């Protein structure tokens, strides 16, 4: 899988790095260990000591691309498909963790810049695709698209199945359009 290969490339960059490159971190205990100057730092990141996260954006747009542009919020079937995609991502990172000893995790990415940039790149490559690139941005991770106007409680309920899958973290964002929401 391409995502695993990319993350393993990041890990490989630590191989051969000696503790002396950052003595406060690796030799004086800031990382919870005291290595010798010529010790390889990569080993301390195994066994869950640190995480390397797979982030994702655009679950809403992915569902639209695969199943049409009915809104995810309005369809239990589409919601189930979206959750299944994120569950599969979580299973993958858990498997990679078991296979390598590195702390792979799934990060429900809050990345407005990336949501904008990737949509622009995809629009340039594939044109305007209704329900996918037509807004000019992708939705953050599992978030409810901001164009869907619901109250904050319904938004939280809609997003509730996803945080337990986000072993690398997530953000819950509520937008209030009034200084005194009711």
Model-derived regions: residue spans:
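Flexible helix-coil linker/hinge segments at domain or subdomain boundaries
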Residues: 6-15, 90-101
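Conserved small/polar residues in nucleotide/adenosyl-binding loops
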Residues: 176-181
């Amino acid at each position: 899988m391409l995502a695993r290969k990319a993350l393993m490339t990041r890990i490989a960059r630590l191989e051969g790095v000696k503790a002396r490159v950052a003595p406060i971190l690796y030799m004086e205990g800031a990382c919870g260990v005291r290595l010798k100057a010529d010790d390889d730092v990569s080993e301390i990141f195994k066994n869950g000591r640190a995480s390397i996260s797979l982030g994702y954006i655009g679950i809403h747009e992915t569902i639209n691309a695969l199943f049409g542009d009915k809104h995810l919020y309005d369809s239990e079937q589409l919601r189930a498909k979206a959750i299944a995609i994120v569950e599969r991502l979580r299973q993958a990172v858990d498997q990679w963790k078991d296979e390598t000893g590195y702390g792979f995790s799934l990060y429900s990415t809050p990345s407005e810049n990336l949501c904008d940039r990737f949509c622009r790149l995809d629009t340039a490559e594939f044109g305007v695709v209704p329900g996918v690139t037509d807004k000019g941005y992708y939705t953050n991770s599992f978030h409810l698209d901001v164009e869907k106007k619901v109250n904050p409680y319904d938004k939280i309920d809609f997003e509730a199945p996803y945080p337990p899958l986000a072993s690398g973290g997530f953000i819950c964002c509520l937008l209030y359009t009034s200084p005194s929401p009711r």
